[in-house]
Amino acid sequence: MDRKMLKSKIHRATVTGADLHYEGSITIDLDLMEAADIIPYEAVCIWDVTNGSRFETYAIEGERGSGVICINGAAARLVAPQDLVIIASFVNMENAEAIAHEPKLVFVDDKNRMLESRKEVAGQATLKSVHWKN
């Protein structure tokens, strides 16, 4: 049996741009792509923490060290600069491999510089926690 598993995640990156007239994709700083083991043209899911939108596109490499996270094409209508997003990629693997699998999780600061790569802790609070207003 195959399972679809989280392969990698860039957690709470800040959107630096939204280019409606580019042909599609998400431009990601090459340093972050390498840290998260995401390659050019790999499918990625984008989850906008700020507004709740979710969509799938593909990654293209941005300038190394630039901190760029730019949503391109039609999906640019789903985000705004300064939104916080989670960028995730998935992989299918056999059950035995999936049991031992550990995804690459990359945590960034507000300038999209990598802070650390570590395991995710269930229920963990972050310094950037959103406080819901009624």
From Swiss-Prot:
Pathway: Cofactor biosynthesis; (R)-pantothenate biosynthesis; beta-alanine from L-aspartate: step 1/1. It is found in: Cytoplasm. Is synthesized initially as an inactive proenzyme, which is activated by self-cleavage at a specific serine bond to produce a beta-subunit with a hydroxyl group at its C-terminus and an alpha-subunit with a pyruvoyl group at its N-terminus. Its main location: cytoplasm. Its EC number is 4.1.1.11. Signal peptide: none annotated. Binds 1 pyruvoyl group covalently per subunit. One of its GO terms (molecular function) is aspartate 1-decarboxylase activity. It comes from the Bacteria. It holds the Pfam family Asp_decarbox. The keyword Repeat does not apply. Belongs to the PanD family. Catalyzes the pyruvoyl-dependent decarboxylation of aspartate to produce beta-alanine. This is Aspartate 1-decarboxylase. The lineage of its organism: Bacteria, Pseudomonadati, Thermodesulfobacteriota, Desulfuromonadia, Geobacterales.
